[in-house]
Amino acid sequence: AKNIRVIRFPAWEPIHNYPLPSPSPKFFRMLFLLRRERPDIVISRTRFFATSLLALAYAKARGIPLVHIEHGSDYASFNGSIKTFLGKCYDHVFGWIVLRFADRVIANSQASASFVKKLSGRDAMVIYRGTKTQIIEQCVPDQKTVEAYRGKTIIAFIGRLIDGKGTRDLITALARLERTDIVTFIIGGGPEEAHLKKMTTKYRLENQVIFFGNLPFEKALGILKTADVVVNPSYTEGLPTSVTEAALCRKAIIATDVGGTREVISGSGDGFLIPPRRPELIAEKIRYLLDHPDEREQLGKNAYAEVSEKFSWDRASDHYIEILSGLAENKKKHR
């Protein structure tokens, strides 16, 4: 894109997907060069990433307003109680600092705003992020996939394969179903993929669970559009993009009632909301939708009606422009 410059600093990952700046000469040279830049606003996203703390330090050192955008609605969930405890400790120190000292905090859901209040004691403005509605509307189901699995009812999951997404519960639910008339698509990649494949082997589901890995957005969407039911079994969410996209694809949705999911679908006629970590309930709802195709179709239509007007990039952009312009103007007045 024009007028966008990406600067990538060297990093290492003590925990997968949570990079820390590498204290190398290259990193410190880049920090020094950033002193020449004259931004009007600094923006950080999600308080438990080290980049948010780095953005805060840079903004305060330069006297530049910091806008923090929070996506999380709970403490980070890790595979292991020790990691989860350490993550919570990090949040109560460094996450709190980011949220308390940012000039403005924006949350992408009411659930995220509630968590900001809980962790830091301050209020956050809610701006729902938009969706690529036009692209989703124009995308057609992948015809090769349609032909390959004709006659099967298709269940789909789309998202990162990390512990917090609860994908193990979906595999466990499929094992409980013992149905041969379905196939399940896992669209996305991540550190959980190897373990999930072992689970499918253990439960003899190798021919019923298809792993697509990471795909370009439109290709992934084409696969998603072939599905009859979309399952989002997450343990924690801010505002789940996958649920929003599934609704815009007019799919019947089974999702865990966590974070901002209830702000996408209500669970009353537009999909099923269930508690997290309950694979038996996932199996129960899938079985119901398999046996009631007409209701499955109606749930998808209702979900689309709920979401199509609510998540608009035009509306979100207007809010952001108003906030950023106001902060930049205020900064100029106080120079």
Regions inferred by a protein language model and the residue ranges of each:
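Conserved donor-binding/catalytic core segment of Leloir-type glycosyltransferases
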Residues: 148-174
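Conserved acidic donor-binding segment of nucleotide-sugar-dependent glycosyltransferases
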Residues: 267-268, 272-279, 288-293
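Aromatic "clamp/platform" in nucleotide-sugar-dependent glycosyltransferases that forms part
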Residues: 235
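Acidic anion/phosphate-binding donor-loop and adjacent secondary structure
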Residues: 131-147
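Short hydrophobic beta-strand element within catalytic cores of glycosyltransferases
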Residues: 252-255
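Short alpha-helical donor nucleotide-sugar binding micro-motif in glycosyltransferases
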Residues: 214-215, 222-227
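Nucleotide-sugar donor phosphate/pyrophosphate-binding loop at the beta->alpha transition
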Residues: 65-67, 75-97, 101
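Carbohydrate-associated surface elements
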Residues: 111, 130
